[in-house]
Structures are given as structure tokens and as C-alpha cells.
Amino acid sequence: MFQFVTPVGTQNGLKATCAKISPDGQFLAITQGLNILIYDINRRTVSQTLVTSHARPFSELCWSPDGQCIATASDDFSVEIIHLSYGLLHTFIGHTAPVISLTFNRKGNLLFTSSMDESIKIWDTLNGSLMKTISAHSEAVVSVDVPMNDSSILSSGSYDGLIRIFDAETGHCLKTLTYDKDWKRENGVVPISQVKFSENARYLLVKSLDGVVKIWDCIGGCVVRTFQVQPLEKGVLHHSCGMDFLNPEDGSTPLVISGYENGDIYCWNSDTKSLLQLLDGSLYHHSSPVMSIHCFGNIMCSLALNGDCCLWRWV
């Protein structure tokens, strides 16, 4: 079960908007205003502040695989890569709307970004050039992900209700996943809010704006697990709440972690679908929607809309 470790405080009264654990599990990158705070998880203190050149707030951030750089996506349509020691390395300009999601490939030489402009762009992080633009969807592309151990494929999720798998090198669409008979509702499609590959890249964790979390078999193109809390009266949530896989360090079955609008966090066994734990938001420091969930090893970071950021440990 999860044990609460500590709340993560920010500076100057500004609330956190994004939070991600570093690849070595030692640090937490937190966006605050137009800056990034590097929080030392073991010492429980802010060890560094990175200043960005963004003109508008962040949408997302991610660490490079070597833990030396952080990429940021902003509402100002731009993307920046900042080195922890040397500062700003690149500013990528090319999207024509806010950038929503981004991820590095395993080697760190490519950065994939997605935007409200309905496209995915592939950037060369070494020379700072745009390599390819993928016209991926008919609505905003709100999530992209690359498998941890396989950089040959890329997944995307969009407000058009579709999930796509691409060849990361050519940009060719390999597969389109839909919710079949459930894909279209009376009031339209159910927008996708987040996608996340499993460690072996065989499965894709997908969350939609109706709060439902599903595991897709990427090869078979079918849903193999569905996780759902109490049905929603209006069918669609007001916020895009976070979710992630947690892969326990003891090698046991991965967990599916999902946050919700009332501040609750649900933890399921990904194989049996059994609910292992419910973290009550009213008791565990979250009194507003859980916008972000990020896991590394046995550590989970949760971030709420009101800026409350918390660290947890699976024991």
C-alpha cells in the first residue's frame, strides 16, 4: 500500500503546475510560475531553480533520459530544453497553438511534442532542428508517449477520441485504436486525456475525459482491462486528471494509478483489476482535482489543481 512521505512546498506562494520525478528517482522537477524548481527527494529541499524564457505558463515538462536536461511545453506555443548545469540549450518554435505534451526517446536525441494545433512534431535535440511534423488527429493532441525500452513507436491521444500508434522514425500511422461501439456517444466522442505505454510496450494505458481508464493490447488492438469508479452523471469530467503505471521494485504486478476530480487517487492491480487502495483526497492533502500522477520505482508524485504536490511510497 502507499504510505504518505511528504508534501512538497514551493516558493513565494506560487502554486506548482507540473511535477515529474527524475530518471534516477533522486529529484523532482516542479514548475512554478515561469521557473522550474529542482527538489531533492532525499533531503526534502529545493536544491536548484532554473529560469526559463517562456512568456506564458507551462503545460508540461519531462526529463531527458540521462537526467541532465528538462524539456518544457508552454502555452506560448514554444518548447525549451534546459540543461541543469549550462542553462537554456534550445528553443523550439513551430507549433501554432499551445504545446500540451512532450517526451524524449530512449537515447534522448529526439523530442516528440504535441499541441492544440492537432499535430505532433519530432525535434533533433542535438542540433535543435525540426525533423518531422505528423498531422495526427482532427482535434488537439493532448498526450504523447514513447516506450521506456523501445523508441521505435510513438503513441498519441486526442480530443477527437482516437488513440494512434506511429512509427517514430517515419511518422507513419501503424494502428488506430478506438472504443468501438463505445467510441461515439449521443453527445459526441469521448476525448482522450492521456496515454502511457507499459514497460514492455505491449500495452497502452489510456484515460478518457469520462474518467474511465483502459489497458489496450497494442498488437491485438483490443481493450484487455477496464478500470472505472462510480459512473458520472454528466458523462464527461471538467478536468483532465492524471494517471500512470507503477512498476514495483520487487517485480510484482504493475499497478494502475488514477486521480480524480474530488482529489481521490485509486490504485488497482493491473492484472486482476482489484482495488488495492483508495487514497481519500479529503484526508491526504488533496482537496481539488488530481491533475498529474507520475511514478518511478516505488515512488509516486501527485499534483492537484490547487498546487498541492505530494510524494508517496509503495511498501
Swiss-Prot record:
Main location (coarse class): nucleus
Biological process (GO), any one: telomere maintenance
GO molecular function: histone binding
GO cellular component term, pick one: chromosome, telomeric region
WD repeats: 53-93, 94-133, 136-178, 187-228, 238-278, 285-315
Subcellular location: Nucleus; Chromosome, Telomere
Alphabetized CDD domains for the sequence: WD40
Keyword Zinc: no
Domain of life: Eukaryota
Consequence when changing residue 180 to K: Results in nearly 50% loss of H3K4me3
PROSITE patterns found in the cross-reference section: WD_REPEATS_1, WD_REPEATS_2, WD_REPEATS_REGION
Classification via Pfam families: WD40 (PF00400)
Effect of residue 186 to K: Results in nearly 50% loss of H3K4me3
Keywords: Chromosome, Nucleus, Repeat, Telomere, WD repeat
Subunit structure: Component of the Set1C/COMPASS complex which consists of SET1(2), BRE2(2), SPP1(2), SDC1(1), SHG1(1), SWD1(1), SWD2(1), and SWD3(1).
Function field: The COMPASS (Set1C) complex specifically mono-, di- and trimethylates histone H3 to form H3K4me1/2/3, which subsequently plays a role in telomere length maintenance and transcription elongation regulation. COMPASS recognizes ubiquitinated H2B on one face of the nucleosome which stimulates the methylation of H3 on the opposing face. SWD3/CPS30 establishes COMPASS trimethylation activity and may also serve as the anchor point to properly tether and space the other subunits.
PANTHER family xref list: WD REPEAT DOMAIN 5B, WD40 REPEAT PROTEIN
Name of the protein in question: COMPASS component SWD3
Gene that specifies this protein: SWD3
